[in-house]
């Protein structure tokens, strides 16, 4: 069996191919049809804009950003202490927001909102509600 497989493969001597034998290929590999396994829960599915998955993700992210801006950020800024002041310069993260909601806060709250949304979507898919 190994000798027939070696005769059907091309042989090389340096960069030049040597003569290929014309022996017929006998049962080296059988082609099996591809079968789909599972229901594709881990695959990415592009739904329309008003799909339930999209609405859950948008709602959870929006609620987390709203909670961060109006609930979490003002209380965090009130409890902050002065800390060590070595040099009085602008950090580059400050915005004109009166509550002090910065870019870092936006990214953090958006990330937490996405994590909550993914958990809700996967949980609902697991019980079959979506």
Curated annotation (Swiss-Prot):
<dbReference type="GO" id="GO:0009534">
    <property type="term" value="C:chloroplast thylakoid"/>
</dbReference>
<dbReference type="InterPro" id="IPR000549">
    <property type="entry name" value="PSI_PsaG/PsaK"/>
</dbReference>
<dbReference type="GO" id="GO:0015979">
    <property type="term" value="P:photosynthesis"/>
</dbReference>
<dbReference type="InterPro" id="IPR016370">
    <property type="entry name" value="PSI_PsaG/PsaK_pln"/>
</dbReference>
<dbReference type="GO" id="GO:0005634">
    <property type="term" value="C:nucleus"/>
</dbReference>
<dbReference type="GO" id="GO:0009535">
    <property type="term" value="C:chloroplast thylakoid membrane"/>
</dbReference>
<dbReference type="Pfam" id="PF01241">
    <property type="entry name" value="PSI_PSAK"/>
</dbReference>
<keyword id="KW-0793">Thylakoid</keyword>
<keyword id="KW-0812">Transmembrane</keyword>
<feature type="transmembrane region" description="Helical">
    <location>
        <begin position="103"/>
        <end position="123"/>
    </location>
</feature>
<dbReference type="GO" id="GO:0009507">
    <property type="term" value="C:chloroplast"/>
</dbReference>
<keyword id="KW-0602">Photosynthesis</keyword>
<dbReference type="InterPro" id="IPR017493">
    <property type="entry name" value="PSI_PsaK_pln"/>
</dbReference>
<protein>
    <recommendedName>
        <fullName>Photosystem I reaction center subunit psaK, chloroplastic</fullName>
    </recommendedName>
</protein>
<comment type="similarity">
    <text>Belongs to the PsaG/PsaK family.</text>
</comment>
<dbReference type="InterPro" id="IPR035982">
    <property type="entry name" value="PSI_centre_PsaK_sf"/>
</dbReference>
<keyword id="KW-0472">Membrane</keyword>
<keyword id="KW-0150">Chloroplast</keyword>
<feature type="transmembrane region" description="Helical">
    <location>
        <begin position="48"/>
        <end position="68"/>
    </location>
</feature>
<keyword id="KW-0809">Transit peptide</keyword>
<dbReference type="InterPro" id="IPR023618">
    <property type="entry name" value="PSI_PsaG/PsaK_dom"/>
</dbReference>
<keyword id="KW-0603">Photosystem I</keyword>
<keyword id="KW-1133">Transmembrane helix</keyword>
<feature type="transit peptide" description="Chloroplast">
    <location>
        <begin position="1"/>
        <end position="46"/>
    </location>
</feature>
<dbReference type="GO" id="GO:0009522">
    <property type="term" value="C:photosystem I"/>
</dbReference>
<keyword id="KW-0934">Plastid</keyword>
<dbReference type="GO" id="GO:0009579">
    <property type="term" value="C:thylakoid"/>
</dbReference>
